[in-house]
């Protein structure tokens, strides 16, 4: 898996991602090592405490008013004569905390998509205002267990995304286990 093609929240495609800023993040699996006096230097039992997790981080550098509004909340402003609100002329920050929680898809150049049914975007306006760097929206995508208790994320070929994803769900683990059993029998 390599190369970020697009980051999507439901049907919204996030703007340009800063080169080399995307990191899968997260935590490594944790375990407790049980050691015995009779066996020096190596554990006699390893107890799994938690699976590993992902928490992607990335910087959005396409800072138009629509992206500021979509990723940070707040209010877009329009000229008085723009009654259809087609061309924003400004943006103001929100007065309350804003959470973008729900389904996310990270479409990769390599042909896969990472699907996250229940992700929460934490974002802030950051970066530098110089002639060699730009301001950016610094984002962390926290991955949580879906309300239905299904898998927190999965990776599929982009051209074969499961039907369940139309409801922003991943296929049940049982169907995946059945498919792998069928493959083993062939």
At which residue positions do the language-model features occur?
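Solvent-exposed edge beta-strands and adjacent loop segments
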Residues: 1-68, 118-136
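Intrinsic disorder/low-complexity segments
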Residues: 7, 94, 98, 108, ...
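Short secondary-structure capping micro-motifs at structural edges
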Residues: 40-48, 85-94
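Beta-strand secondary-structure signal
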Residues: 55-59, 103-105, 138-142
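Beta-strand elements of well-folded, non-transmembrane domains
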Residues: 58-64, 108-112, 143-147
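Charged, amphipathic alpha-helical segments
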Residues: 63-93
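Acidic, glycine-rich flexible loop segments
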Residues: 88-129
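Mixed-charge, glycine-accented linear interaction segment located at domain edges/termini
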Residues: 113-186
